[in-house]
């Protein structure tokens, strides 16, 4: 990593997060422009990305984003499904940036007639290859571009490159999470000696089918709980009650006076005064 302030360098925990998310595993093909970010090439053909340079570019990109006067002038785009949840969380956490998750509407930066027209001052992408339409239109109107780039990504019109594995959902999520955290640190919202209370898992892609199954399972469990009458919710009065207290009545009192073994004065076997069989 280039010389600079030690406070801006990655910690051991940051490097471990990047390694666990497989941010360093690049594609097998490598362009000439991206070769300077490659640490080495493995025997299986995978290019290993230098994580120190990755974190250095994350800090540089965060400094550019923090320099924009209003977060609403920053536009985050992800045509790739793995990055759509990440950009939505990123835009929310940095204070209201404009996200475009999914298909980019052609002419959104150049055609002033349509409703989707936007004039951002900065563009942040997940993949310049997938979001090529946004890259081309941004070049027409001179919008600076920051992009997550794999070693096989085209760098034309891209101003700041964040070298990483942008094809893995965990790698994309952790890079966007670190970018948002660094922006908050540079703004002074988050102290550098404090842990961010937002977990990286919040930025990871989740399969809609998996979410649907979890919701159905939770609904079924709640329905079964309602049918049986079983509940785990107890109020404070019931929990604080003294269940060992004795009652106020005298349940051990002696029986009433009298000879219970004496014979009765009447003849219970006597026949009735009239014939019942008539």
From Swiss-Prot:
Annotated region described as Disordered, given as residue ranges: 216-235, 250-278
PROSITE patterns reported for this sequence: RIBOSOMAL_S2_1 (PS00962), RIBOSOMAL_S2_2 (PS00963)
Entry keywords, A to Z: Cytoplasm, Ribonucleoprotein, Ribosomal protein
Principal subcellular localization: cytoplasm
GO BP: any one term: ribosomal small subunit assembly
CDD domains for this protein: RPS2 (cd01425)
Gene3D superfamilies reported for this sequence: Glucose-6-phosphate isomerase like protein, domain 1 (3.40.50.10490)
A family per Pfam: 40S_SA_C
PANTHER family found in the cross-reference section: 40S RIBOSOMAL PROTEIN SA
Family that this chain belongs to: Belongs to the universal ribosomal protein uS2 family.
Name of the protein in its database record: Small ribosomal subunit protein uS2
